[in-house]
Amino acid sequence: MLLWLTNFLSQHFHAFRVFNYLTFRSIVSALTALILVLSLSPRLIKYLVSLQVGQMVRNDGPQTHLKKSGTPTMGGVLIIVAIVISVLLWGDLSNRFIWVILLVTVAFSAIGWMDDYRKIIRKNSKGLSARSKYLLQSIIGALAAVYLYFSATTGAETALVIPFLKNVLPNLGLFYIVLAYFVIVGSSNAVNLTDGLDGLALMPTVMIGAALGVFAYTTRNHFFAQYLAIPYIPGAGEVVVFCSALVGAGLGFLWYNTYPAQVFMGDVGSLGLGAALGVTAVVVRQELVYFLMGGIFVAETLSVILQVGYFKLSGGKRIFRMAPLHHHFELKGWPEPKVIVRFWIITFILVLCGLATLKLR
């Protein structure tokens, strides 16, 4: 929004030309989101407390979680709002990638909001039925995938980047739609499953979001793309503004969400942020690298799938003490902060490995 104004002003005042630089707009986007969340979170927490919008804790979970009951939730609304405001202010609103990512993020957050709302109103931890939630996610994910496929202007936008292999970029054709759909929907649910401890999902989301911003920056530049043997995607650079806003908003919220959490982001935050990472990975053509960097999300999801499947096949036996995986380690006696920080460390290592794929080919 401000880019249109500064483009006009820069014709008369040279100082405004700095707003044309992607790096500058990305930095101020992150700072805007960070300041918004840091300054408004205390008021939001008080407001949620006054409304008695408290977390409902399941009785069959770890007993240490019972003390979390009543902690304000749905704070993820502020994360999403801060991201949207920052991107609308500092992004190029004529860029189609920006709008796709924003709309997917907001739509999945809306699903999360409905889920949180039902949990609070009905005073249970069930929320939306799994079928209803998945149906809504599928519609949005499929629409986004179809749009990205048919709006592609170059073959590079639908090519699959295979890590560590140089000049191997198979065009997916219509299979692109299937892959994009599963990445968006799967990512949303994976982050949601991981968001079971204070800050556990948020810090990995921030780290991966920053890394995807690096990929977006390199993909936008023809010279960088050619040198690194990755697809050149015109317009993908604006995604950096979104990633920066995500990082800023995430860090700001983490200030209040870190152990012991003063507020939870709820499904409105985790579903939206998960979808944001997924659709961003699709846009910058780094689905497989995202699978690597989001190893914690993958492990958490697989632990649930394996646990449920084995439980049904074995007649009640379990692989893990409890799923998702972070609960397994809690029941083994690991303190919650230890589980959180170790998962963060693993994600940091995986993100470095993901960034290394830019050069190791």
UniProtKB/Swiss-Prot annotation:
Pathway: Cell wall biogenesis; peptidoglycan biosynthesis. One of its GO terms (cellular component) is plasma membrane. GO terms for molecular function: metal ion binding; phospho-N-acetylmuramoyl-pentapeptide-transferase activity; UDP-N-acetylmuramoyl-L-alanyl-D-glutamyl-meso-2,6-diaminopimelyl-D-alanyl-D-alanine:undecaprenyl-phosphate transferase activity. It comes from the Bacteria. Keywords: Cell cycle, Cell division, Cell inner membrane, Cell membrane, Cell shape, Cell wall biogenesis/degradation, Magnesium, Membrane, Metal-binding, Peptidoglycan synthesis, Transferase, Transmembrane, Transmembrane helix. It is found in: Cell inner membrane. Its EC number is 2.7.8.13. Its cofactor is Mg(2+). The chain crosses the membrane at residues 18-38, 73-93, 97-117, 135-155, 168-188, 196-216, 235-255, 263-283, 288-308, 338-358. One of its GO terms (biological process) is cell wall organization. It catalyses: UDP-N-acetyl-alpha-D-muramoyl-L-alanyl-gamma-D-glutamyl-meso-2,6-diaminopimeloyl-D-alanyl-D-alanine + di-trans,octa-cis-undecaprenyl phosphate = di-trans,octa-cis-undecaprenyl diphospho-N-acetyl-alpha-D-muramoyl-L-alanyl-D-glutamyl-meso-2,6-diaminopimeloyl-D-alanyl-D-alanine + UMP. Pfam families: Glycos_transf_4, MraY_sig1. It is an enzyme of class 2 (transferase). It is a multi-pass membrane protein. Belongs to the glycosyltransferase 4 family. MraY subfamily. Catalyzes the initial step of the lipid cycle reactions in the biosynthesis of the cell wall peptidoglycan: transfers peptidoglycan precursor phospho-MurNAc-pentapeptide from UDP-MurNAc-pentapeptide onto the lipid carrier undecaprenyl phosphate, yielding undecaprenyl-pyrophosphoryl-MurNAc-pentapeptide, known as lipid I. This is Phospho-N-acetylmuramoyl-pentapeptide-transferase. It comes from Coxiella burnetii (strain RSA 331 / Henzerling II).
